[in-house]
Structure formats: C-alpha cells, structure tokens
Amino acid sequence: MKKLLLGAAFMLGAITVNAQDGPKVGQEDLSLYPNVEEYGIYPLWGWYTAMGNQSYGTIGANSRGMAITADGTKMLIPNRTDVKVDDKLVSSTIEIIVYSALTGEKEKVVKVSDDIWNHGNDDKGDPILRDNEANDIQVDAAGNVLLWRMSTNIGVSPAECWAVNLEDGSVKNILSATVEGLEGRFDYFGVYGDVVNGDGYLLSATSNGDELYGKTVLRWRYVGGVLQPQDESDQIFITAYYPSSAVSNSYGTRVCPVNEDLFYMDAFSSFATLYNMDGTIADSFASIADEATRNAIQPMSAGNNGVAEFSLGGVNYAVYSISNQLDAIQTGLRLVSLNDAMEFSSMKLVYNLPAQGMGNISNPERTVLPRVIVDEAAGIARIVIYCNRGGAVAYDFGLASVLDKLHPDRVPVGLQGNKVPTLRVTSTKGEIVLTENADIEVYDLLGRKIVEKANTTFVKVLPGLYIVKAENAGYVLNTKVVVE
C-alpha cells in the first residue's frame, strides 16, 4: 500500500452530523468500540443480518454494488429487474435506490432511462436489448455516478459503462467494448479520475476460474472525457497471487485503482493485494515477516471481496474484507493503520467492522464493500459498508476528542475522569434493570420512545428487543437489551 487511494476516498468540505437525540435506530452497542489510543469510532446506523433488522427490500442477486455521492450524504445501491422469455431479454427496469448515508433511511428511487438497456434496432430492424445492466456502481473523482454492465463473455458481449443523472435518470454511454480473442466474465469495475469530462481510467478484472482467461485485468483510458484506443499495456495479466495457492481471479473479483501505476485486487481465492500495472505484485500481506502478526492482520479467509484506503490527519488507513459467513467474525472487515509509505508490513489493527461481523450471509456475488468519505476540516472519516444480500452499516472515525464533540451521546469506554463507569443494563422478565440509579429512555427498533423515567433502577416493558439510553453521574450508556 504505497499511496493514497484517491479513487476510494472522497475529500469533503463538511460531513453532516446526526443531531437526533437519544439512541440511533439500528445503532450497535457502543461498548464494542473502545478508544484505540487517541482515536475512536462512532456507529451511526446499521441495518444488517447480525442485528436482525436487515430491511433493504432490494438487496439480492441483482443489487451487487454500492457507492457514496461525492458530497458524502447519499448511499447509492443499483437494482435491476430483467424480464426474459426463452432466455432472451424482453424488458428491464433499472433503478438506483438512494439512502441517507447519515441515517441509512431510504430517500428515493431513481428510475434510470430505458436507453441503458434498449439500444434501438439493428440494420435488420431487430431490437438491440442488453441484460445485466447496473451490475455495479461507482462515483468518480468528479462526482459522476457510473453504472456498469456485466459482460458474461467480453469477446462477444460488450462491457458497458453509463453516466447517470440522479435528478432525472438520464444516461450517457461512455463505454461499450468487446475484446477480440478474449473470453471472460467481467462483473465489476473500478474508476480513477474523471472519466466523463477529464482524465482517468476504468478497470475491470475477469471473474473466471480458468488459468487461460482467469488472470486478466482490462483498463480503458480517458483523456478529456474521450475514450482512448486500448494498447497492449491495457490488457494486464496477473502473474501471482497471495496466498500463492490461488491460480486465477475466480469469482466476484474487485479491483480498486490507486493511481496511474497501482491498483488493488481482491479475488475469490486471494486476499486484497496491491499490483503494478504490469500485473506483478507491488505489496501484499506476505511482506509481514512475523507469522503470528501476519495471521492477526490478514483476512481469516478469502471469498468476500472489498478494499479501500484513506488518510486522515496525516495518518494512513486501509479497510478490507477479512471473512466469510462461517468465520469467527462472520462477514466482516478490518480497519488498520499504516506508515507513511503505506506498506503492508506496517499494518496495525484499529477495529474490526462490525465488531461481531455482519452475520451468516449467503453471498454468492462476493460483495462486501467499504466506501470512505474524508472530511479533513472536521477531522472525520465516514466509513460505509455494504454487504450484498446482508445489509449496510456506517461509522464516523477520528480522534476521540473530535467524536465526543460531534456525537455527545458517544460512550467513552475505560477510564473517564480517573473513574471507571459501573452503570450496566440487564433484564429480567418484563423489566429492564439498571445496576445503579440512573435516568433511562427506552426505544423500539423504529426509534419510537417507549418509556422514560428519571432516577430509577428499573422500568417495566413488554417482551421484545429495545434500545436503551441510561445516564448517571455524567456517564451515558447506549445499548440493546432483550426482554422476555
């Protein structure tokens, strides 16, 4: 990890802070995230399998990507519904579901123009219809929203990329390309720079398991918003993987551009690895010499794919997928810090996100994506994570002192004013019980206040799952509790 990954972290002027009083709907137990040295993290919201509140109706096989708008306020998830007769497309509905990156609540649905899949008629008058549109989504450095068409065989079926206007759903095609002599499925893509009006490139890797076509990464370069002819350097052949037991990109491969010379690839049988544009490894977890240290930092298993890196306050970080649904942390990611050169060998664990994983999720599309929005002025990085079929979760990360000011209800864990807080929340049948007198507010999972009581050690409630805010002696505790 050599340089800041400009394609994965947006630099913002301001990040909006949630001013809602009381516990946040879907917020994790804050005690899971103690401060790490002078840094802390604040879970904004979570709607995912392990929390039991995964409520996104569109998450499924055809909602495989996620992106964040350039201003950091919106989470975008594409969705398609293809209607086929005798395995031939007859119609398609392409949508971008827009959620608040601050609260996770759905805000609107953008119906994308049918021009994205209906390309008119050919010379014989037959309709030209494309399936598999909107298989992935990205936002480039200029804030352009891009949708990707999956090619199941790029030798005969074009990979396509479309710029989408979120106001009216209109589209502009910036790529429709086949590659003669190459067979391969290209599910997802990455973007660097401004590919609509400026300079940059698109990058996509085969999701093939064979050794002949399954090691290919393709690049499409843009100058002044104009697609350039591909040359030999744009057809990249991967020469090695980590772990070395991997023999191809295989399924659901994700690529993440760093700059003109470097990109990350996270593949089905290999871990997130930094590559040169000639397909050789620039850096990997193999550079961590001590085996125990390496095992503590590298993924528990391959399979789920996603990686990003960013800098905040002069410190470099990376966040990457570490597990599948059957690992100790089920479907999780890891946030680490790095040295100035961003070398794998310098990685130090900061947090696992979510701390207990997103859950036991069947995810054949292999999507577990981190997206990061950085606001240097505020001293905050907002990390949003999306798991195909499994949900999403968001965090604010930064100096603990900054987080405490932005989120007054944040619970510092450990020593506070040279005292250790002893307030805890438990339950008995029909009651929420406090270990000492405190003011208590109880909310249901929809954020509705159920009961509020001052200076008490218990409140009576009906059986169910509740979010509890309790406060005494200046300490604030937010947690979840199940009452029988």
Predicted segments with their positions:
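Loop/turn-rich, solvent-exposed surfaces of beta-rich toroidal or solenoidal domains
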Residues: 270, 290-351
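Signature of short aromatic-glycine-proline-rich micro-motifs recurring in repeat-based ectodomains
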Residues: 48-68, 120-138, 147-151, 179-208, ...
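Surface-exposed loop and turn segments in beta-propeller and other repeat-based domains
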Residues: 23-58, 107-130, 170-192, 226-249, ...
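C-terminal outer-membrane/trafficking sorting elements
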Residues: 414-484
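Short glycine/acidic-enriched loop and turn motifs that connect beta-strands
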Residues: 80-90, 151-157, 207-213, 269-271, ...
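Short coil/turn segments that connect the beta-strands within blades of beta-propeller domains
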Residues: 71-73, 142-144, 198-200, 259-261, ...
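Hydrophobic h-region of N-terminal signal peptides that target proteins for export
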Residues: 9-18
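Beta-propeller blade signature
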Residues: 91-104, 157-169, 214-225, 331-338, ...
